[in-house]
Amino acid sequence: IDLPDNQAPLTTQTRREDLDSPKFQGTKTSIDFDSATGTINLAGSGLFDTITDFDAVGSLDDFGGIASSGTYDFGGAAGSTTLDLGGVFSLDLKRHFLTEGFYPSDLFDSRGLIDDMTDFDGATATEVNAEMLVRVTQDNPSGSPTYTDFQTFANGTYKGRGFQFRAKLTSTDTAQDIKVSQLGYTASLQRRTEQGNLTASGAGAKTITFTHPFFVGTSSLLGANTNLPSVGINAQNMASGDFFEVSSISGTGFTVHFKNSSNASIDRNFTYQAVGFGKGG
């Protein structure tokens, strides 16, 4: 009996928009990037061409008051829109999200004398909010996919092939803004075991197809075929000198060939156990 080794869950992607260089390369709608703080925040709602007195404008980014809402969309790599698993799998997602509300006009560097400050910490912005959202498709993202609606990103398991992520910022007070300093997620696949019933090999190479495909990696996620399942064979009614060869292991199946001591093909019964990552289909 050749049994596969137990393995821990597989982290397929750890995405951090704030750790890219440059930071936050996703699609911004009514969102600005602040290079001084390395964060994103709601943009100003005013138009640059309507400014009549630049000296009277405290912040060009926030001119006209803070936008009521804005979105930042991202995917599986810097500047991309989609995380593509290459097939439909049940994927565990855990979000990474750090935000802070603030008054742009009440930043420390823009204040006067310390002795004149009534509140050293500044006013608390309570009329802002930030949400992290996700939507999923079971179609090929590079084709004409149909996605679910964006839903609240709660840590849990999502079934799909393509995943798109969004940070949504809102403010009900044009004087209050909110910034995102850390944004991303961790995607992982659980280890699982698939067992096959007693099967006759026939006198030749026997091809076995898994009930559910395993994730083995793609060119953009860990590398193609870098995480093949391990396959164990439990052979029955073997005679002295009999042996078997396992080949063509993939995410969808494998081939087993039983032979005798003369290297001739023989028919033997067997069961199998495959251990890998992700439940496809």
Labelled PLM ranges:
Residues 1-204, 208:
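Beta-strand-rich ligand- or partner-binding modules
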Residues 191-281:
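Extracellular attachment/recognition segments
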